[in-house]
């Protein structure tokens, strides 16, 4: 895969330096945030400056390496850290802190748990050696996600073309699953990219994805940057577009895929899957193996993050529709919903799509896994070991 196809960088990293594209400001502004502390990365994740399950995990790993290098210099100057174990303790505590930043996406916890295990079992006996281990582990995670993207793109594009039995296909998606959500090309949107690069994409239909409008702000932004043919639709138009347009497949990303195939993804994905089943449009989930969670039996065991009411009740005057009271004070906010003592707002960030509605299959870097014709539809433990 040639990097010439893709100029977007949500993550800018070189040893000792990490910058994350502030995705709250897109598409109106392109601003990168410097990550120099564990508090910085936790804030960036919680406030959705960085978002997308793979990007969150990669950013956390790289942040740990960058912060460790900065802390080592400072602590040595102050004579606080004296042994390799002092540094290990800092790294382990930092992993625990980052793990709580967003609960639903499994990639973050899986990456940090693995980092903790590797750091704890590492035999390095100097602080410098512990740092080198941390940096190498983080950079390996970064490189692996790029490779996962490339393989998901190829597997998904080839399978969709074979399934559709036509030269050019129409795809429907939700949220943003492209370069802005991963380390490079994307998962579901990466497949769309591959189809486009090969001349096999007729058109992409992108849901706006309320309330943060990741489809309108981010997916459309990526498509415009690369001249990918795209039509933006309201979330409530998915049934209409499937009825009136020749949609060949729905392809979405995932924040967690349970052992039985139940999938947590951006709110509205469940609606999309129901509509796809009714209109007999194949529904696919595209995600790296780091998103697979064989330890959670089904969707009932997934903690669904809920965010503040202001994301629905307020609009921002200059931030492309960003509504968070806490994270967008610099944009200015205006309430557009009547208020009253009996009004309640429910704002779940994710929903669970039952495995029975994933009619096309699950696409990972290891291939395409269609639902079984007998027995359980999916058994994620057969795709990836826990």
UniProtKB/Swiss-Prot annotation:
Task: Extract the signal peptide range.
Answer: none
Catalytic positions?
Answer: 255 (proton donor)
One GO cellular component assignment for this chain's record is: nucleus
GO MF, one example: S-methyl-5-thioribose-1-phosphate isomerase activity
Location of this chain's protein in the cell? Cytoplasm; Nucleus
Query: What's the catalysed reaction?
Result: 5-(methylsulfanyl)-alpha-D-ribose 1-phosphate = 5-(methylsulfanyl)-D-ribulose 1-phosphate
Q: In which pathway does it act?
A: Amino-acid biosynthesis; L-methionine biosynthesis via salvage pathway; L-methionine from S-methyl-5-thio-alpha-D-ribose 1-phosphate: step 1/6
Main localization, broad class:
cytoplasm
Under the heading InterPro entries, the entry gives:
IF-2B-related (IPR000649), IF-M1Pi (IPR005251), IF_2B-like_C (IPR042529), Initiation_fac_2B_a/b/d (IPR011559), M1Pi_N (IPR027363), NagB/RpiA_transferase-like (IPR037171)
GO biological-process terms attached to the record:
L-methionine salvage from methylthioadenosine
Query: What SUPFAM superfamilies would the database entry show?
Result: NagB/RpiA/CoA transferase-like
> Which residues carry the site feature described as Transition state stabilizer?
175
For this protein, the Enzyme Commission number is 5.3.1.23
Keywords, sorted A to Z: Amino-acid biosynthesis, Cytoplasm, Isomerase, Methionine biosynthesis, Nucleus
Task of the protein: Catalyzes the interconversion of methylthioribose-1-phosphate (MTR-1-P) into methylthioribulose-1-phosphate (MTRu-1-P).
Similarity section = Belongs to the eIF-2B alpha/beta/delta subunits family. MtnA subfamily.
Could you identify this protein by its name?
A: Methylthioribose-1-phosphate isomerase
């Amino acid at each position: 895969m040639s990097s010439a196809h893709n100029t977007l960088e949500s993550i800018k990293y070189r040893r000792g330096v990490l910058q994350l594209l502030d995705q709250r400001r897109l598409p109106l502004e392109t601003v990168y945030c410097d990550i120099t502390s564990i508090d910085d990365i936790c804030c960036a994740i919680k406030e959705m400056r960085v978002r997308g399950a793979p990007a969150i995990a990669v950013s956390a790993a790289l942040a740990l390496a960058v912060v460790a290098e900065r802390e080592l210099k400072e602590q040595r100057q102050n004579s606080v850290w004296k042994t390799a174990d002092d540094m290990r303790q800092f790294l382990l505590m930092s992993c625990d802190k980052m793990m709580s930043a967003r609960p639903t996406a499994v990639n973050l916890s899986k990456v940090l748990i693995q980092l903790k295990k590797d750091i704890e079992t590492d035999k390095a006996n100097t602080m410098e050696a512990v740092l080198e281990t941390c940096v190498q582990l983080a950079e390996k995670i970064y490189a692996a996600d790029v490779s996962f993207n490339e393989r998901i793109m190829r597997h998904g594009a080839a399978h969709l073309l074979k399934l559709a039995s036509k030269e050019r296909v129409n795809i429907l998606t939700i949220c943003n699953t492209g370069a802005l959500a991963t380390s490079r090309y994307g998962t579901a949107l990466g497949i769309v990219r591959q189809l486009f690069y090969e001349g096999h994409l007729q058109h992409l239909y992108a849901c706006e994805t309320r309330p943060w409008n990741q489809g309108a702000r981010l997916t459309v932004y990526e498509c415009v940057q690369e001249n990918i043919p795209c039509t933006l639709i309201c979330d409530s138009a998915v049934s209409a577009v499937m009825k009136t347009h020749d949609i060949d497949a729905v392809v979405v990303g995932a924040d967690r895929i349970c052992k039985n195939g139940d999938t947590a993804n951006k709110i509205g994905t469940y609606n999309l899957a129901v509509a796809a089943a009714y209109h007999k449009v194949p529904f696919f989930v595209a995600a790296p193996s780091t998103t697979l969670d064989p330890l959670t039996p089904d969707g009932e065991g997934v903690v669904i993050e809920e965010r503040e009411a202001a994301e629905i009740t307020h609009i921002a005057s200059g931030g492309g529709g960003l509504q968070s009271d806490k994270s967008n004070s610099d944009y200015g906010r205006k309430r557009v919903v009547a208020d009253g003592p009996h009004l309640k707002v429910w704002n779940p960030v994710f929903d669970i799509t039952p495995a029975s509605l994933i009619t096309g299959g699950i696409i990972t870097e290891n291939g395409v896994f269609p639902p079984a014709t007998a027995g359980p539809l999916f058994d994620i433990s057969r795709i990836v070991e826990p």
